[in-house]
């Protein structure tokens, strides 16, 4: 692959920042969103810092990975403008690391709204590095080396823009994670309450009635209750009484229901349906429908990648010298392999029809060998052939 020279790099100039791991609530969510939408001086770093804290939710991660990884694993094809497969260029790009990095940045625009990154060479191999979203203002076209500072670079006016430096997505879009933030915050609240309930469940409150006007007796009573622990005995004054109050009567269903509701909403937002592991009383038909809805979203993601490659990536790679001719990035059409296999086996039963073994291997991954015709000496007589046998 021909290596061209690059004038400026932007990722190494970004100042690293320590993100405070404080507890987030709905107020943080609304404040960050208001700063994002500020018309005079928009600041995006509080919003993306908030997304970095909620994206660690395991259920949310699993839903995003189910959709994104299935899209990234799809094989692609490079064709010329006439629709003919360019096998050499396809094989070359399939072995390049930057393909995965670029496609991931494109897909992340579905969840984050926007991605800005740059190509670079590392040990002679082309890579694609994402510029932290906290440091980018795509509405005005700015890159901030320090997102808390006002010093900026107008990246769309740089000569690297459109070749080394490329962007995807919508400048004003919050992405799908916007609707996920409240449910992750509610879920964390429910988890915290449920954890606290587990600590005190089954432990009844202890009540000591004493003379509150006597500070000595109050202090002695407090010390006794603190030191009592799980002991089965204690000493009190004859004027004091000790008893157990009514303990916790709930088993935490209200918290579990809230967590389940939040998980279901996260599944609906990312996958378009509540799939298998999230349902208690599902059915085969429902699961097939849910998987079909998820597949529709994956097909939409594949279409997004195709459009971005053909309008943005390939023109940039032509400037860099990676692609030297007109090309089209595409995915093979989706096929129902179960239905196709059934049709193939039925077609093979017809006389004078032969299914290509090479096509079977490429489509289904099955090694097929042609059956050698039996020799005349190995042919067995059939009673139905008696008319031809007797002369």
What does each model-found stretch correspond to?
Residues 2-50, 74-228, 233, 237-238, ...:
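Structured, contiguous alpha/beta core segments that scaffold functional sites
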Residues 59-62, 244-246:
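Positively charged, small/polar-rich N-terminal and surface patches that mediate targeting and assembly
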Residues 73-80, 86, 243, 247, ...:
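Charge-rich, low-complexity amphipathic helices
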Residues 99, 107, 261-391:
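C-terminal helix-loop subdomains that flank or include functional centers
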Residues 126-129, 216-220, 243-247, 335-344:
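Short, solvent-exposed polar/charged micro-motifs at secondary-structure junctions
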Residues 187, 191-311, 315:
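A contiguous, surface-oriented mixed alpha/beta subdomain in the mid-to-C-terminal portion of proteins
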């Amino acid at each position: 692959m021909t290596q061209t020279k690059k004038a400026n790099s932007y990722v190494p100039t970004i100042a690293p920042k320590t993100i405070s791991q404080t507890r987030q609530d709905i107020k943080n969510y609304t404040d960050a969103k208001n700063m994002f939408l500020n018309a005079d001086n928009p600041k995006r770093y509080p919003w993306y810092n908030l997304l970095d804290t909620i994206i660690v939710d395991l259920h949310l991660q699993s839903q995003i990975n189910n959709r994104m990884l299935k899209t990234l694993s799809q094989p692609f094809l490079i064709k010329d403008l006439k629709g003919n497969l360019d096998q050499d260029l396809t094989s070359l790009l399939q072995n390049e690391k930057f393909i995965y990095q670029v496609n991931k940045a494109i897909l992340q625009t579905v969840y984050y709204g926007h991605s800005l990154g740059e190509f670079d060479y590392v040990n002679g191999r082309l890579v694609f590095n994402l510029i932290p979203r906290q440091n980018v203002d795509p509405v005005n076209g700015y890159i901030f080396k320090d997102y808390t500072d006002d010093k900026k670079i107008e990246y769309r006016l740089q000569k690297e823009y459109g070749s080394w430096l490329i962007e995807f997505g919508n400048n004003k879009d919050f992405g799908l994670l916007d609707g996920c933030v409240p449910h992750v915050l509610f879920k964390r609240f429910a988890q915290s309450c449920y954890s606290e309930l587990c600590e005190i469940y089954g432990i009844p409150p202890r009540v000591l009635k004493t003379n509150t006007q006597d500070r000595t007796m109050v202090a002695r009573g407090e010390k006794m209750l603190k030191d009592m622990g799980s002991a089965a005995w204690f000493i009190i004054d004859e004027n004091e009484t000790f008893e157990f109050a009514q303990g916790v009567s709930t088993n935490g269903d209200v918290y579990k229901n809230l967590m389940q509701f939040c998980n279901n909403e996260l599944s609906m937002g990312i996958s378009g349906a509540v799939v298998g592991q999230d349902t208690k009383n599902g059915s085969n038909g429902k699961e097939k429908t849910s998987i079909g809805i998820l597949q529709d979203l994956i097909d939409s993601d594949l279409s997004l990648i195709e459009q971005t490659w053909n309008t943005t990536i390939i023109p940039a790679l032509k400037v860099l010298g990676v692609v030297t001719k007109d090309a089209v990035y595409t995915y093979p059409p989706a096929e129902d392999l179960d239905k196709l296999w059934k049709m193939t086996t039925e077609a093979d039963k017809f006389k004078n029809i032969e299914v290509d073994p090479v096509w079977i291997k490429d489509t289904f991954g099955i090694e097929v060998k042609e059956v050698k015709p039996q020799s005349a000496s190995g042919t067995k007589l059939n009673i139905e052939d008696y008319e031809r046998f007797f002369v």
